[in-house]
């Protein structure tokens, strides 16, 4: 291929990304609407027709998804707690995260993956708890099975994760399937990676039956692990996310750097490098790090040097109430005293340029 054409193909992915309309998963706002399912379905802007139909047809599932938004956003904030961008959400913003996720960055890849995983987790859990009419426990886990410890009987309530994945795919992917641009393909890939991550941590739990706990008989079921497992796994995928470009026919990806491996279905992918998130920026949606607490003794991302972007920090002396002198009393209580602890809190200085306060 001659060099001018090669240059066009190198720039095409960026052009596709820049020309992509403002994309956001508006269903993320479902956690903030509250009220009945009809209120939720009619008041979340930006849902496509098939999403709104599913919303009206399955109000019990929508309640579970709405409650699940709090869980996966909290997990996102936990994973990013020591980073300049800390997965902060914006009140009264229908996109939940503002403009920051319009960039096809690693952060966007993570949020799309963990939100998709959050839907799988919330819907599957609601099924097992009998809160959804259209599903229940996994109907395939019946009869007997065999593992390394021998034969067992399927019993209890195995989490119906296949239903959760199927519903998440139909609902979450609906808006992206209508698009043919690069960002839609990126979102679909990361959505799928998120769904798959929940099933990865499905574990078998068993209960023993028999004389004196001999475990001559076992009843087993499949259960999802705590959502933190999924969050930790996707965090590792975020740190190993692969930068990609569109292939020449616009149907898939290829690695931006030939030295890196081709992404698998489990990997997160992104197009654009992230901003540094140091200062408040209306264009990128960054809220900056002014006022963020930093760790004076750390050498990691939460260190005052890194978190404050070299601007320095302020130190305040504060006291807080803690439990101390705890003692175990027979039987069966732990009694503690209330003590005041004095400590220094370090917070990042604001940029000297007054323009940093411009609203996002």
From Swiss-Prot:
GO cellular component: cytoplasm; extracellular space
S-S pairs: 76-87, 127-135, 137-157, 206-220, 208-215, 278-309, 294-304, 308-348, 324-339, 326-336, 331-332
Top-level taxon of the source organism: Eukaryota
Entry's localization field: Secreted, Extracellular space, Extracellular matrix; Secreted
Lipid tethering residues (O-palmitoleoyl serine): 212
GO biological process, one term: positive regulation of neurogenesis
MF GO annotations: cytokine activity; frizzled binding
Identification of the protein by name: Protein Wnt-2
Organism whose genome encodes this protein: Callithrix jacchus
